[in-house]
A protein has these predicted regions:
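Basic/polar N-terminal segments that are highly enriched at the extreme N-terminus
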Residues: 1-8
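Active-site core of metal-dependent hydrolases
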Residues: 10-125
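Active-site proximal loops enriched in glycine and acidic residues that flank catalytic Cys/His/Asp
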Residues: 47, 71, 100-101, 282, ...
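Short linear, low-complexity motifs centered on an aromatic residue
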Residues: 76-92, 109-112, 215, 222-224, ...
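Glycine-rich, acidic/polar active-site loops that bind/position phosphate-bearing ligands
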Residues: 125-314, 323-326, 333-572
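C-terminal low-complexity, glycine/proline- and small-hydrophobic-enriched intrinsically disordered tails
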Residues: 430, 466-472, 494-677, 694
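Conserved small/polar residues in nucleotide/adenosyl-binding loops
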Residues: 678-683
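Hydrophobic topology marker
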Residues: 685-687
């Protein structure tokens, strides 16, 4: 047996959490910090100094030499600048370790060097980071040493949000405020806050690092641009939940330990559908902490993989022909006195509060399906969505048989007198127990599915931050809650008003419910008849952010200003254009410097073989046929390469970033696909096989 691991002892040991604060802070200071965490507000300068000193002392005792304001700019990954704790030496030349409350609360990175969509120019560089007191500081150890990481928000000198966290925190306040209005109407006077909770299921690939380093396309783009299918892929369906191989198991073990030390509740691990694909799922947490922890998970996966001679691939579609990777975003809302607003109970037809919440969510998703789709838009996700492995690009809601039956009754009669029950599942084996059976099945093809006491948003890409999807979810549901509360707070007869409102919302927005096969062509046709948007690509979703509907929504709840939304639309176009340009240039480079020279060399060998066989007095029928085929494909590839070079140059020279991004989508990408198709039949030497294991 291996050494026994005491998970309880190591969990959170590298986190400055509430337990550590309680031990190290004076009682009155701890109470003030806890109050600000729970109710908002600011710490007094004196309190901030005490907290900063305690945090610094704890970090230094654990080997830290530097601290950083750890934030999430609009690149989608985290950013950090390390400052050491050293201060001015005293008169005796002794170094003093310093860290003030001001340094804890505020930092000042260069705002012009991050994506801003025009909010910051090069000569307007000042930006600020602000401590997110609700997300605990943690220690990160790597080749640079031990660093104290302080989760922060990031904004410009003029106050615009330049990150993913600030809008998320704003949206959390919005949904809390509006949800409280609803629960108050149902007599709950104890709750003071409603929290959005999130649990993201992170999928990823692991490949051997040495094989990875031989692939220029994987290095530069995160996915293979050339290659042929492996003889065996996922056809036998034997990888999903299969036995975890030793090398991968060793990686997972180290990953768990690293994450547990960082306070990340890594819970579930298993093989996924595609060869070399795996999943890690944590326990639910408050939305902003879940976002921070998901960034930590992705970063730690990459670091631990290197240690094991592996490379972690987070791209949504690193290999054609097998499933890509997503990040199912499980979302629920809970009061601080312990009530999950998405828990239907044993008899959901009698749970009026749940039915109102459900009706509001149906309304929110129907009205803002375009925004929800945009929140999961990503360059890599364009290759994954709607490919019989992931949800379609059409937003719909799966409720299951039980809730759909309740909704049907409410629409038809205004009340639901019954609901379907789960019953028992008989195994037919005397030594096995009869199993409690859920009242409804699960639908893996739905992009937004109710799964018992939460909604699972399955569109999110594996490499993407979960901040935007949860910001959007919180915002659109907050709006629906607000509009419902506006009606019900004025009602003379609350019981009648709430029943009428539930029926109204469900009747008007029933079109968004779909319990069938989301992969089918019939659903695409049906969705069009229902008037549901089918937004197929990242850049086609960009302008949904700046419609009047979207601007009114986000400005009403102070989540985004119009300028912030316009900047994000601009960044989407820029990101898309740059990403596709990198792929095109990588493809050009590989074709011109690696593949075509290899084909030429191969054809030379074939030509020599033809001559040698002829010289031996035998007709080289097969060899000549193969040589002709290779030369024909070589000519096609060279011609296609010339077209791609021309189209890439034309697109990269464009100045209008929106027009440029669509040029890449409509012209450059098809040129890339054309060149790939000319090569596949003959270039057996380019096989990019999916490994059965890393």
């Amino acid at each position: 047996m291996s050494e026994v691991l005491n998970v309880e002892a190591i969990f959170g040991e590298n986190v400055f959490n509430l337990g550590t604060m309680r031990e190290r802070l004076p009682k009155n200071v701890y109470k003030e910090v806890k109050k600000v965490m729970d109710q908002g507000g600011e710490l007094s300068p004196a309190t901030a100094d005490i907290v900063a000193k305690a945090m610094k002392d704890w970090a230094v005792e654990n080997g830290a030499t530097h601290y950083t304001h750890w934030f999430q700019p609009l690149t989608g990954i985290t950013a950090e600048k390390h400052d050491s704790f050293i201060g001015h030496p005293d008169e005796n030349g002794k170094m003093l370790m310093e860290f003030s409350g001001k340094e804890l609360i505020k930092g000042e990175p260069d705002a012009s060097s991050f994506p801003s969509g025009g909010l910051r120019a090069t000569f307007e560089a000042r930006g600020y980071t602000a401590w997110d007191i609700t997300s605990p500081a943690f220690l990160k150890e790597d080749a640079t040493g031990v660093i104290l990481c302080i989760p922060t928000a990031f904004c410009s000198y003029t106050g615009e949000a330049l990150d993913k966290k600030t809008p998320l925190l704003r949206s959390m306040e919005a949904i809390s405020e509006q949800a409280l209005r609803l629960v108050r109407l149902f007599g709950n006077t104890r709750a003071t806050k409603v929290t959005a909770s999130v649990g993201p299921e992170q999928e990823y690939f692991l490949v051997d690092r040495q094989k990875y380093l031989k692939r220029q396309d994987l290095i530069f783009t995160g996915r293979t641009l050339f290659g042929a299918p492996a003889p065996k892929g996922q056809e036998l369906e034997d990888h999903y939940f299969g036995v975890i191989r030793e090398r991968i198991g060793a990686f997972m073990k180290d990953l768990n330990v690293e994450l547990w030390k960082l306070g990340v509740t890594a819970k579930t691990q298993h093989n996924e559908v595609a060869p070399a694909q795996h999943e890690l799922a944590p326990i639910y947490e408050t939305a902003n902490i879940a976002v921070d922890h998901n960034q930590i998970i992705m970063e730690t996966m990459k670091k631990v993989a290197e240690r094991h001679g592996l490379r972690c691939l987070l791209n949504e579609k690193p290999f054609a022909g097998v499933n890509g990777s997503g990040k199912h975003n499980n979302w629920s809302i809970t009061t601080d006195d312990g009530m999950n607003l998405l828990d239907p109970g044993e008899t959901p037809n009698e749970n009026i509060q749940f039915l109102l919440v459900l009706a509001c969510i149906l309304k929110a998703v129907d009205i803002h399906a375009d925004l929800l789709r945009q929140s999961a838009a990503d360059v890599g996700n364009d290759h994954r969505l709607g490919a019989n492995e992931a949800p379609p690009a059409i937003i719909s809601v799966f409720l299951g048989e039980q809730l759909e039956d309740v909704v049907r009754q409410l629409i038809e009669t205004g009340e639901a007198k019954s609901c379907l029950l789960g019953g028992k599942l008989m195994t037919g084996v005397s030594t096995l127990p009869d199993l409690p059976k859920d009242a409804t099945d699960r639908n893996r093809t739905s992009p937004f599915a109710f799964t018992g006491n939460k909604f699972e948003f399955r569109m999110v890409g594996s490499a993407d931050s979960i901040a935007s999807p949860n910001t959007t979810l919180n915002a659109i549901v907050a709006e629906a809650f607000c509009e419902a509360a506006d009606v019900l707070e004025k009602a003379d007869d609350f019981d009648m008003a709430v029943h009428d409102l539930i029926k109204k919302y469900m009747t008007e927005h029933h079109r968004i419910i779909f319990n069938g096969n989301g992969y089918s062509d019939e659903w695409v046709e049906e969705a069009a008849k229902r008037g549901l948007p089918n937004i197929k690509s990242m850049i086609e979703s960009a302008n949904t952010l700046t419609t009047e509907k979207a601007v009114q929504l986000f400005e009403k709840f102070h989540i985004f200003t119009r300028a912030e939304l316009e900047s994000r639309e601009e960044i989407i176009y820029e990101t898309y254009a740059k990403s596709i340009n990198i792929e095109a240039l990588t493809m050009i480079d590989m074709a011109s410097k690696q593949i075509i020279p290899a084909v030429v060399k191969y054809s030379q060998k074939l030509a020599k073989t033809v001559l040698d066989v002829k010289a031996a007095g035998v007709e080289p029928v097969v060899q000549s046929e193969l040589l002709a085929k290779v030369n024909s494909k070589l000519t096609e590839m060279k011609e296609a390469l010339s077209v791609l070079e021309k189209e890439e140059a034309a697109a990269s020279a464009m100045e209008d970033v929106k027009a440029q991004s669509f040029r890449y989508k409509d012209v450059v990408i098809p040129a890339m696909e054309d060149r790939k198709s000319t090569r596949l039949n003959s270039s057996h030497w380019l096989r990019s096989r999916m490994p059965s294991s890393a």
